[in-house]
Structures are given as structure tokens and as C-alpha cells.
UniProtKB/Swiss-Prot annotation:
<feature type="transmembrane region" description="Helical">
    <location>
        <begin position="149"/>
        <end position="169"/>
    </location>
</feature>
<feature type="transmembrane region" description="Helical">
    <location>
        <begin position="263"/>
        <end position="283"/>
    </location>
</feature>
<dbReference type="GO" id="GO:0005886">
    <property type="term" value="C:plasma membrane"/>
</dbReference>
<keyword id="KW-0915">Sodium</keyword>
<keyword id="KW-0472">Membrane</keyword>
<dbReference type="InterPro" id="IPR004670">
    <property type="entry name" value="NhaA"/>
</dbReference>
<keyword id="KW-0997">Cell inner membrane</keyword>
<keyword id="KW-1003">Cell membrane</keyword>
<dbReference type="GO" id="GO:0015385">
    <property type="term" value="F:sodium:proton antiporter activity"/>
</dbReference>
<keyword id="KW-0050">Antiport</keyword>
<comment type="function">
    <text>Na(+)/H(+) antiporter that extrudes sodium in exchange for external protons.</text>
</comment>
<feature type="transmembrane region" description="Helical">
    <location>
        <begin position="363"/>
        <end position="383"/>
    </location>
</feature>
<keyword id="KW-0813">Transport</keyword>
<feature type="transmembrane region" description="Helical">
    <location>
        <begin position="53"/>
        <end position="73"/>
    </location>
</feature>
<keyword id="KW-1133">Transmembrane helix</keyword>
<feature type="transmembrane region" description="Helical">
    <location>
        <begin position="332"/>
        <end position="352"/>
    </location>
</feature>
<feature type="transmembrane region" description="Helical">
    <location>
        <begin position="294"/>
        <end position="314"/>
    </location>
</feature>
Length: 393
């Protein structure tokens, strides 16, 4: 019996979809708690201070820096040694990601250009890689591997775009002295890389210093995670010429972070930030411009932007559809890109100081992501392959 339970737990942890499922559960739990008799304790705990920061700030500024470290490692690995390692491979997901960020932002601005909430334009521009891949993996072999690769590549480029947006548009009150010290930390990390240092310990220690001064500078501290990731060596250790690329420092660090990030950090973030108390909000909150802009941006803007870009590139002969994929399958995959949970929530906290606007954005994220996720799942579940056969056949 104990062995069977252990095997069940192990299979869950090894499943592609389990991280997304756990994130869904943590978000649902946050919503339930925030609207129960425990709501006061929930919000009180988030705003309680541990040292210099509140619990919510520790989650959003410190734990999420580790999440962004893993995102940065994924970006570098794919650019150097993966699905984005050549320009032809980057064209389709790159163009789709760019359009998939621009169109949702425009949809949001159509609702909020003149009402003081325009600063939230980037909220629906992000795709949640954990959720999207979690949903598509639930369909198993019904979805061709090429589409999973396309979705992963698009989401990674989307994450890179989100990181750039956060750095450029959601940074205020910069301290030049601390920023200079953070830059010195980056220079030291680059020097380690160029010197051929392969041990991870010096990089991680300097990464902590970089995080501290980045946080102090006013630039969002999570950017430190990405900068650290880009300096981690991906080449094999010279002393082990027989070693595979998968034994590089970057791959080893990424592998060690996957489960802690997927099963601890991201669910904690979801639980700490998805809680919206509907008490006193009223139905008008569901139809507020911010709510409508975010929901429409995710559910409609992502679809129009990404599918439109793919359609244009394929019909003009620049690229072809992913191998074995049909247009209905591409449509379903595009819909899944409208799941914008983690990164969208994160940007909403940076965009708005007003709790009411934050709550409206969260409602929009939940509605848009739910509609996009369900629609994408249904379309993919009943789509036919490029050869016309049902996946169930």
C-alpha cells in the first residue's frame, strides 16, 4: 500500500501537467479562502512583515526571482541548444509571440485608453507557460509533439518579452548608485563565465548580491534572476570532454530548479496573489473597463494576434505549419496562449497600486484565462489531424 502511494506521488511529480494542476488548485484555494471566514487571517498573513519585507513582498520579489532564474535558463538553453537555436526555427514562434503581445495590449487599451488605467496594458500580453503546457499535456498523444514544441517556444519568447517589458515600463524611482552596484555584479558574473568557471556556487553567491542591489535600485528584483541565468555556462566542463551537453552547469541548475519552482514557488505565488475578495465588489467589477480589457485581451487578443501571424506567415510561404499539425489544432493551441495567469498576475501588481484596480485585473485574468483554456482544450480534443483522422482513432 505504501509503495503504491509512493508510486502515485512519483508519477504525479513527473507528469508534465502536474505543475499546472497544482497551480490551478492553489489559485482556487486562494479564491475560496479570500471569500470565507478565513479571509481576514489570509490577507493579514500576506501583509505581515518578516524582517524588512511583508510576506507578499518576499513571495513576489524573492521567490519569484528564482522563478525568473529558471525562465532565464530556459530561454538561454533554447537559444543555444534547443528549439530556438537557429533563425529559421525562431521565425514562427517569434513572430507569433510578438503579435500575441501587441494585439492583446491594443485590445486592453481600447477599453482603458482614457480612464487612468492605461498603465495596465501589458497585463494580457503574457502567456503562462506552466498552465498552457499543463493543459495541452492533459490531451496526451492527441496533440502532435510539433505543436507542443511550438507552444513551448512561443511561451519562452513571450516570457522574454514580458521580462523586457517589466524592466522598461514598470520600473520607477531608480537609485543610480545601487543600479551601478548591480551592474558591477553582472560584470563580475560575466567575468566568471569568460574565465571558464564552471562551479555554480560562485555564480549563485554573486546572484544573491545582484538581487540585493537590484531590489535596492528600484528595478524589479526578479530581473536579477534573468541576468544571473544568462551568465550561467552552458558549455561542457573541459575536464569531462566525454560529458554530454545535458551535464553543463546550466542544465544541471535548471534540472534542480524544475520541481521546487513548479511544485513550491509557483503554487505559493498563485495562493498569495490569486485571492480576490468579492465582498463589496458588486457585479460592476465584472464589467469594469480593466476587467473587460484584460479578459478580452487574453481570450480574444491572443487568438487574433497569434493565429493571424501564423496564418500570414504560412499563407505567404515564409514558413509551414508545425509537422503533422492541422489548422484546427493550431487554432486550439493559439487559444491556450490566452492563459495568462502567473505573469499576468505579476504584472498587474506592478501596474496598479490601487487594490480595486488590482482586483479588477485579477478577475479579468481569471475570466480570460478560464475561457481561453477551456476553449483551447475543447478545440484540441475534437480536432482532426492533418491527414483528416480523429486523434481518438
Amino acid at each position: 500500500m505504501a509503495g503504491r502511494i509512493q508510486n502515485t506521488i512519483r508519477n504525479f511529480l513527473d507528469s508534465e501537467s502536474s505543475g499546472g494542476l497544482l497551480l490551478i488548485a492553489s489559485a482556487a484555494a486562494a479564491l475560496l479562502v479570500a471569500n470565507s471566514q478565513l479571509s481576514e487571517a489570509y490577507f493579514g498573513a500576506l501583509h505581515a512583515y518578516l524582517g524588512p519585507l511583508s510576506v507578499q513582498h518576499w513571495v513576489n520579489d524573492a521567490l519569484m526571482a528564482v522563478f525568473f532564474l529558471m525562465v532565464g535558463l530556459e530561454i538561454k538553453r533554447e537559444m543555444v541548444d534547443g528549439h530556438l537555436s537557429s533563425w529559421p526555427r525562431r521565425i514562427l514562434p517569434g513572430a507569433a509571440a510578438a503579435a500575441g503581445m501587441a494585439v492583446p495590449a491594443l485590445v486592453y487599451l481600447a477599453f482603458n485608453l482614457n480612464n487612468g488605467a492605461a498603465h495596465g496594458w501589458a497585463i494580457p500580453a503574457a502567456t503562462d507557460i506552466a498552465f498552457a503546457l499543463g493543459v495541452i499535456s492533459l490531451l496526451g498523444p492527441r496533440v502532435p509533439t510539433s505543436l507542443k514544441v511550438f507552444l513551448a517556444a512561443l511561451a519562452i519568447i513571450d516570457d522574454l518579452g514580458a521580462v523586457i517589458v517589466i524592466g522598461l515600463f514598470y520600473t520607477t524611482g531608480v537609485s543610480l548608485m545601487d543600479l551601478g552596484l548591480a551592474a558591477a555584479g553582472v560584470a563580475a558574473l560575466v567575468a566568471l563565465n569568460l574565465s571558464g568557471v564552471k562551479r555554480l556556487t560562485p555564480y549563485l553567491l554573486l546572484g544573491l548580491v545582484l538581487w540585493f542591489f537590484t531590489y535596492r535600485s528600484g528595478v524589479h528584483a526578479t530581473i536579477a534572476g534573468v541576468l544571473l541565468a544568462l551568465t550561467i555556462p552552458i558549455k561542457r566542463t573541459p575536464a569531462k570532454p566525454e560529458a554530454t551537453v545535458s551535464e553543463s552547469p546550466l542544465h544541471l541548475l535548471e534540472h534542480s530548479l524544475i520541481k521546487p519552482v513548479s511544485f513550491i514557488i509557483v503554487p505559493i505565488f498563485g495562493f498569495a496573489n490569486a485571492g480576490v475578495s468579492f465582498s463589496g465588489l458588486g457585479m460592476e467589477a465584472f464589467f469594469a473597463p480593466v476587467t473587460m480589457g484584460v479578459a478580452a485581451g487574453l481570450a480574444i487578443g491572443k487568438l487574433v494576434g497569434i493565429f493571424g501571424a501564423v496564418l500570414l506567415l504560412v499563407k505567404t510561404g515564409i514558413v509551414g505549419l508545425p509537422a503533422g499539425a492541422s489548422w484546427p489544432q493550431m487554432l486550439g493551441t493559439t487559444l491556450l496562449c490566452g492563459i495568462g495567469f502567473t505573469m499576468s498576475l505579476f504584472i498587474s501588481l506592478l501596474a496598479f497600486d490601487d487594490v480595486l484596480l488590482q482586483n479588477e485585473a485579477k478577475i479579468g485574468i481569471l475570466i480570460g484565462s478560464l475561457v481561453a483554456g477551456l476553449a483551447g482544450f475543447i478545440v484540441l480534443r475534437f480536432s482532426k489531424r492533418a491527414d483528416g483522422r480523429n486523434f481518438s482513432q
